[in-house]
């Protein structure tokens, strides 16, 4: 029989069952399971087991609620039409599926867990909140920073997803979702507010580590590369002349984008011992708030915009990029540093953007309180504008990462590159879920 769970997931399930049985005084069953699974108290001690006591019940109630929701949805005509919609063409629509409210100050950032239905949000009051976006419930409040939380990202070594946060308190903190979001490490080193953090995908040629690297950007005008397993800063990158607002790694982890108040977009080769500037892109007329690499799925559309006869191969990275600025525009760039298109439509600062996993669309949010969808197959035409979704500036936007399943077994929880091209093809499933955070203190979930 083929195995549904990964070895790690199976181990977690076994521990949860043992903890549940122990909590309900089924000692003979506990002893039998511990013996059968070779999980003696020296390996799985009672203190650790206590953390697993309620996990099985939580999972069970989640399944029951999901079953009820599925039954309710199946009776709704709109849900039937939604399920028929191709994920590759899905775009968010109002009203939001959930309006999540618990923050007391503006939300600065959001981040999706790569596998589970968890989402994190960070606010001006140094608070991080963890939610279940599937059910619209607050799971926990995480405290540790002393000033505003400016960015969040999930990632890390395969099989051990971490949450990284950065703050105006000059630090980066690493939290362990598998251990009640315990703060396992604090990374000091920046000399001013840390604006952005992103885990760097594994697979970069020549990279000494795999899945352990984290990039950060700061108002101290540096980008730093960290090893999350040791907490050491491996590289400090200098080149910008003002506050660096955002960073974005390429899919193979070889390149990094950075942008900020000096109005430039910089492309770095971070696979080298001393990172090199490959390109400096100039054109925005105000601070650049956000940047992103275009996924290979968008190359065919962007190549047409760039006037290329043939799209770059899907195996290549760093071919096209996007930036959003306080000058109210979005610019699309090619690998030569040429601005191939300027998208005009927002009436205020562009705060965040994300490419649709299908590559056909680009989504953006702004201080004009709108979410805009741009069709890259139509020369970047704005084909949808969502108004009235928030009551104040929209500060953040994230798309739930797709679920990637290997041919053999598991869902890939690692933020990183699919396996080498020689390997069997992977099954990539688009999750039609986005989240937005706002100065109105609410986190809103849009889904199919």
Curated annotation (Swiss-Prot):
Family matches, as PANTHER family? WD REPEAT DOMAIN 5B, WD40 REPEAT PROTEIN
Q: Which InterPro entries match?
A: Dynein_regulator_LIS1 (IPR017252), G-protein_beta_WD-40_rep (IPR020472), LIS1_N (IPR037190), PAC1-like_LisH-like_dom (IPR056795), WD40/YVTN_repeat-like_dom_sf (IPR015943), WD40_repeat_CS (IPR019775), WD40_repeat_dom_sf (IPR036322), WD40_rpt (IPR001680)
Q: Residue ranges of region Disordered?
A: 74-95
Start-end of each WD repeat: 102-143, 145-185, 189-236, 239-278, 283-343, 345-384, 389-444
* Start and end residues of each LisH domain: 9-41
| Originating organism | Fusarium vanettenii (strain ATCC MYA-4622 / CBS 123669 / FGSC 9596 / NRRL 45880 / 77-13-4)
Q: Which Pfam families match?
A: LisH_PAC1, WD40
Domain of life (superkingdom)? Eukaryota
What Gene Ontology terms describe what this protein does at the molecular function level? Answer: dynein complex binding
Q: Quick one: a GO cellular component term?
A: cytoplasm
Q: What is this protein's name? A: Nuclear distribution protein PAC1
Q: How does it assemble?
A: Self-associates. Interacts with NDL1 and dynein.
Keyword Kinase applies: no
Answer whether the UniProt record assigns the keyword Nucleotide-binding to this protein.
no
CDD domains cross-referenced by the UniProt entry: WD40
Q: Which family does it belong to?
A: Belongs to the WD repeat LIS1/nudF family.
């Amino acid at each position: 029989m083929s195995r549904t769970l990964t070895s790690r997931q199976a181990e977690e399930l076994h521990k949860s069952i043992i903890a549940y049985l122990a909590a309900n005084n089924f000692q003979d069953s506990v002893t039998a399971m511990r013996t059968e699974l070779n999980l003696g108290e020296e390996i799985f001690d009672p203190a650790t087991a206590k953390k697993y006591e309620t996990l099985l019940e939580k999972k069970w109630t989640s399944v029951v609620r999901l079953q009820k929701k599925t039954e309710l949805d199946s009776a709704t005509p709109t849900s039937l039409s939604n399920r028929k919609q191709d994920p590759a063409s899905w775009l968010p629509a109002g009203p939001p599926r959930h309006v999540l409210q618990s923050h007391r100050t503006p939300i600065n950032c959001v981040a999706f867990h790569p596998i589970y239905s968890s989402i994190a949000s960070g606010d001006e009051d140094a608070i991080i909140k963890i939610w279940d976006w599937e059910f619209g419930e607050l799971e926990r409040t995480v405290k540790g920073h002393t000033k505003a939380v400016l960015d969040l990202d999930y990632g890390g070594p395969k099989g051990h997803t971490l949450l990284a946060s950065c703050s105006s308190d000059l630090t980066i903190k690493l939290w362990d979702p598998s251990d009640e979001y315990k703060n396992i490490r604090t990374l000091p080193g920046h000399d001013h507010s840390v604006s952005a953090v992103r885990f760097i995908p594994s697979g970069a040629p020549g990279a000494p580590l795999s899945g352990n690297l984290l990039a950060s950007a700061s108002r101290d005008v540096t980008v730093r590369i960290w090893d999350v397993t040791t907490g050491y800063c491996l590289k400090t990158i200098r080149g910008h002349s003002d506050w660096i607002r955002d960073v974005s790694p390429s899919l193979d982890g070889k390149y990094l984008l950075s942008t900020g108040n000096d109005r430039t977009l910089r492309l770095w080769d971070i696979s080298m011992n001393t990172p090199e500037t490959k390109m400096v892109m100039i054109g925005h007329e105000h601070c650049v708030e956000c940047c992103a690499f275009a996924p290979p799925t968008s190359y065919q559309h962007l190549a047409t915009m760039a006037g290329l006869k043939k799209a770059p191969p899907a195996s290549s990275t760093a071919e096209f990029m996007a930036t959003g600025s306080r000058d109210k525009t979005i610019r699309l760039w090619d690998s030569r540093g040429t601005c191939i298109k300027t998208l005009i439509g927002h009436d205020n600062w562009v705060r965040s953007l994300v490419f649709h996993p299908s590559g056909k669309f680009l989504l953006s949010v702004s201080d004009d309180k709108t979410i805009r969808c741009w069709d890259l197959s139509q020369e970047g035409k704005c084909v949808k504008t969502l108004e009235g979704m928030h009551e104040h500036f929209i500060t953040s936007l994230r798309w739930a990462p797709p679920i990637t399943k290997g041919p053999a077994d598991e869902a890939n929880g690692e933020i990183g590159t699919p396996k080498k091209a020689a390997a069997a093809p992977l099954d990539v499933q688009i999750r039609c879920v986005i989240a937005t955070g706002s100065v109105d203190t609410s986190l809103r979930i849009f889904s199919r």
